[in-house]
Amino acid sequence: GHRCAGGVADGERHGGRGVDNGTFVTAGLVLRETETKESDKILTVLTPELGRISVIAKGARSRRSKYTAACQLLAYDEMTLRRKGEWYYLAEASTIELFDGVRQDIEKLALAAYFAELTEAVCQDAMAAADMLPLLLNALFALGMLEKPDRLVKAAFVWRLLAETGFAPLADGCAVCGRESPEAPMLDVMQGVLRCGACRTGGGLSLPLTEGAVQALRYILYCPPKKLYSFSLDESGLRMLDRAGEAFCAVQLERGFRTLDYYKAFLVEEDGE
């Protein structure tokens, strides 16, 4: 059955718990679905306790499957799993939240798919996803339910996710002269430090930020998780913060993201960026 998560979605409520007959129950968010032979799917699932796992969903593509909704990208489910060797097999599933506000908007859905791909990239299999799951659930909730610009949700999610996984930039002042409010601030994306426009760091790629964007970045990095989207920033500052986040992400993770390219194709159509 489908039941709605009340308010902001929480990963904490649904830890793994054992059931007799070798199965156990866990909450999980589907980060990726891969079609395999016949009518099966392999799901990449983010769970509170096991981190990122692969789940084989037998018959999930069949029209008769009861679990079609639960086995789609970005479905947040309660799953009953059975483990065999390295693999988990889906025994039962019911959806907790499908994020309809995101699904009904192709642009938001494209952005959410990027959030999922990025989370998968930074969440190593064994790594406890205790912080990752609520972070991603809240981002999906913010995208679908809060009246916030998509660009704000994107910038905040990307910077916070990187910070939570050990890639936080040093944002408390100019790395060269120590000024707390850098003049004509720049972010050195190679070294992950702020500097004044006139102060030189190692000469790698640096991108400009406004003073407001610097304040917003500090807020994003240090605020309580539930307050992540409770800030505002003017359009030009937000564009700079977003661009710097994309560049920092690409440099630190040493890769691009297919879902991000797909999402950005929508933006080009809109405003010819």
Residue ranges and their predicted role:
Residues A5, G18-E273:
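Non-catalytic alpha-helical scaffolds and adjoining flexible linkers that form interface surfaces
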Residues G1-G18:
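N-terminal amphipathic/basic-hydrophobic helices that include classical n-h-c signal peptides
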